[in-house]
Amino acid sequence: MFLYRMPITGNTKKYKETTTGKNKTKKKMGLKHFPTYFPSDTEKEMICMKLNPSNEEELVKDYRKLQLLSCNQIKKQSAETRVGNRIVDHFTLKERLHTKGQQKIDFYTFWKNRAYFRKVPYIRKMLDFYKSRDTDEIRKFKYIFNLYLSSISIFRPILAMELYCMVSAKRVLDFTMGWGGRLLGAHVLNLESYIGIDINTELRQPYDRMISFLREREQPLNKQTQIQLIFKDALKVDYITLDYDTVFTSPPYYDYEEYRHMKQYDWKEEFYEPMIKVTWKYLKKNGHYCLNVPEDIYETVCVPILGQYHSKLIMKKKKRTKTANYKEFIYIWKKV
């Protein structure tokens, strides 16, 4: 899952760093632990409407904008381009806000306990900073949550479309489908098929609603993208029964993200290695295998199994600070 790892700015005294070999980890300091809060559907709807106030007319307009883009135009889109994002947020934001980041707290719990967080010095300072920029309280707290606690983002549909164009994808397998950006991109480009797999059964209803929206956008004379969604552990799927010429996914950054119903693995040995081996095995000849993974996973897992990448696509992201030199890639292999 795409994750922007926000650099911490200012003298918050929130983190201390420890170094083990090449890997640096940041430890939580000074924040009280709260039990996970599960709001009612009504409360979740209210929060999501504040964060993503969109209606069907706006969603359709966004979809049409994506449809009008050629592959060449898609390639030229900047990191600022948000077209299509509101569609994904409209259907899956409610579930995404349950996700815990590196500080082991989700946004619903953060918002529920805002009286405590208001008293944290650097959060109080940021609330004052945002006072003149956005009057809505929920949005202010979400900005701060993204900045200091966790910024778990969607995979932008426009970026998925760029990858599909780059490898001439027709039949896509996405074994950690996440929030729907890659599905939306496949549908807009009218690819032959999209197979999505996710263990989080809470996403079944949001995806059903998204697919209903997409079906209403289809042109009668066009061939429809065949969509198959499988809600189960990706390790238990029989891939020999699936037909795909492109694997494209963005697995969870297991040391940063914690989703509902997420299984606890030794991620390298029990998830990445067997998943890459089995999905590569049944990938069509001349097909493409595309992974958005951290550099250490690329080096320690992907290279021993797949060899060096044949090409890569940089993840276009906004530059939030002058020192934010972190780059993220989609690594691509062709099966010959």
Give the ranges of each region predicted by the language model.
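Class I S-adenosyl-L-methionine-dependent methyltransferase catalytic core
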Residues: M1-V83, L93-V336
